[in-house]
Amino acid sequence: MNPYRQIPRFAFVAAAVASTVALHSQQTGNGPASAPAAKTLTAADCTAAKLGSEIPIKAIGEPVSAVTLSAPQWHAETANAPGYCGIEGSMAPVDKGGTARPIRFGVALPATWLRRGAQLGGGGMNGSIPMLAGGVGRGQPSLLSQGFATYGSDSGHQMSFGMPGRGMGMPGAPGLAAANPAADQWALNDEAIANLGYMQLKKTHDAAMVLLQRVYGDLPRYNYFFGSSQGGREALTVAQRYPEDYDGIAAEVPILSFSTLMLAPELIRIQEKPLANWVTPAKVNAIRGEFMRQCDKLDGLTDGVINNYMACRAIFDRKQGDPNRNPWIARRCPNNVDPNPQDTSSSACLTDGQIATLEMVYSPYVFASPLANGVRSFGMWVPNTDPSGSGLIANVRYRGQEGAADNAPVHGHLGVLGVTGFLFRDLTANPLDYVEGGALNKRRMELSAILDSTNPDLSAFQKRGGKLIVVIGTNDTLASPGAQLAYYQSVLDELERAAVDSFARFFVLPQTGHGLSGTTYNTDGDGKSITVRPIPNVYERLSLITDWVENGRAPGKSVAVTAGERSMPMCSYPEYPKYSGGPAGSASSYTCAAQ
C-alpha cells in the first residue's frame, strides 16, 4: 500500500521534535510576558562548523531519507534588513525510485534575535523558497529587523511561480504552454503531492528548530506562521495539523479547498461545453452592472461598493430561497434570443444558457460524495465587480467544447497540474473530460484528505493558547470567497462564537481581490458614473498578531483599515460595514452589522 495515498498525518514524532515543541510552547499567549532577552550572532558564527552539514532524520516529524545542508552565507546589513546568516538545505524523499523531488528549504538567522520564529508560506503552486528577508505587510519592514528568524521551503518541487511546463497555462490565456514532461513529473507522485499538501510544513519547521538551537543555543519563545494565497492555506493547515508548533498564525486569502479550487475553472468550462451556455467577454459589463444594481445600496449607501456581501450572495445564489426566482430576469433576452451578442454595454441581455452558467458560478457546487472533513460542496464565487477575473470568463472555445476547432487549445490555468497530474494522473489529459461522481471520484476524496485545509475543529490550537487571524476579500477571483466564507461558518458551527472569538478573528474586506486591494466601481447601483477610489485595505498585520500572542491584547471584532485619508472598518464575518451617516470616507460613519 502506498503510504502517501491517503494519510492525514503521521503519528510518529521524534523525541527531539517533542522537546522542541515543549520548549517553544511554554508561552501560550494568554497574557503579557516579559520580553525575551536578545541573542546575537556575527559572521564568525555563520559557519559550517557551527551549523553542520546535515540534520538527523529522527529530528524531523514527517518521513525523510536524509537532510543535508549547504554552506551558510553571511549577508551584510542593508537599508532594508539587518545582517543575517542564511543557510539552505535539502530533504531527500523517501520514495527514491519514483518522481518525488527533494524539499529545498532556507533559514535566515538575524544578527539580533528576539527569540521570535516565523515560517513563511508560499504562493501559486509553490516551487521556490520564500523571500526570507522581507516583511509580511504592505510596506512593512523586514521581519529580520524585528528580531524574527525566518524559514520556509519550496514544498518539494522546483518551479517558477509554481508552474513550468503544462502548468504555465494562465487564466484567460488561449491554452497551455508547451508541455514539459520532465518538469511536471512530480505531479504524478503521491509523496510529492503529500509534501505540497502538508508534510513539507512540518519537515521545514523541524529542520529550522534544529538550526536555531545550533546557532543560538535556544528555541523561539514565540513561533508564528505568515502566509497568503497558497501560504494562507498552509497557515490554516498548520493550525489544523500541527497546532502545538505555533503561537500565532496570520493568513490572508487562503486557498483552503485546494483540491476543488484547482478543478473549479474546469467545472465552469464543462458547464459551457454547449455553445448556448458560453458567457462571452461581451457580457462582463452587464453582469457586474446587475450585481451593482441589486446590491450596491444593501449597505445603506449607493457608492459603487458591495459591502453587504452576504445579502448580495443570497440574491444570486439559487440554492438559497425560492428555487423558482430568477435574479437575472431583468437581463434575460426577450424570447431567449440575443439580438446583439457583441453588445458590451451594461444593458446587454443574457440567454437562458448563459444565465444557467452564471447560476453555477455564483452558487455552491455540490459534490457527488462528501470530501475531507465532511465538506459537501464548494462555495465558488460571490457577486463582484470583476466577473471575468482570473479566467472565470473565457474568450475562446476549448478542445471538447461545442464549436471548438479541431486544433483548439486544451484549457489551462494556474492550477491545471492539480487536475491533469494529481487527479487524472495523466499529464496529457484534457481536463474537460472530468465527470462529477465518475471514475475519478475515489481519487477526488484521496486528494481532498491531503490538500484541503477544511477541518473546522481548531480546538487543539485554541487550547494550547494559539491565536489566529484570517482576512479574505470578496472580489477575489483566484481563491474562492464562497469556500472561504463556508469555512468561517463551519468553524463557528463547530466551536461556537464565544470560543472562536477567544482565539481567532475572521475578517472580510468587501470588494477587494486576491491581493486584498480593490476600488469602487465606476458606476453605482443607480447607474450613475462616479469617481473611482481605492478601497481602504491597510492594516497592521504583524502587530495585530504579535500583540495578541505576546501581550495578550486581542484585536477588536472590527479593525480600521485605511487608504490615504479614507478609512473603513474591517468587520468580522458575517458582519459588514453598514453606513450609518456622515462622511463616506470615514470609518466612524459605519458600524459592523449582520443581516
Show the residue positions of the predicted features.
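Gram-negative bacterial Sec-dependent N-terminal signal peptides
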Residues: 2-24
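Catalytic-loop region of hydrolases
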Residues: 26-116, 129-138, 302-306, 315-425, ...
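Alpha/beta-hydrolase fold nucleophile elbow
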Residues: 218-229
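Short glycine-enriched nucleophile-adjacent loop
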Residues: 232-243
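Hydrolase active-site cap/lid region
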Residues: 241-244, 248-285, 308-310, 392-393, ...
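Short beta-strand/loop motif that positions the catalytic acidic residue
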Residues: 470-472
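Conserved alpha/beta-hydrolase "acid-adjacent" motif
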Residues: 478-482
